Amino acid sequence: MSDQPLNVLFLCTGNSARSILGEAILSHDGEGRFKAYSAGSNPTGKVNPWAVHTLKTLGYPAEGYASKSWSEFADGPEFDLIFTVCDSAAAETCPVWPGRPTSAHWGIPDPAAVEGSDAEKAAAFLDAFRMLKRRIDLMLALPIASLEQIALREKLQAIGHEADKQ
């Protein structure tokens, strides 16, 4: 991998909450080392207002994100890393992506599925944010440029399985 920022794609079905949060966190915390994107297999067409609220509340930029189909990326950019953040997207047949991206599944419960009070919805989005941030922080600590693709995939998968057990 080169000195250029790594292109990272976060995928989920609706591209309205979890994948948007992942894109926003990595865009902010990656400090120019990564170019983050998000997409969905069946996008809702709008970013969930609770995702926007969560980002703003935690001091992250919340503007400029959109719910879009993964087909928008069929012709590039070439992704270095691809993360599925919902179980349904992980189970779907994903497109063949240009290049040789390393992929991993980081399953996060869907905060948009939570019904209840505003406090319960806010808590669900905060939990999803924290889970994604923890995984992204662990990824940012990896010596990505020096890892072979298979070793990198194993480490990224392990982050998805172990991050919230600590």
Task: Please place each PLM-identified region on the residue numbering.
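Residues at the C-termini of beta-strands that transition into short coil/loop
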Residues: 40, 86, 107-109
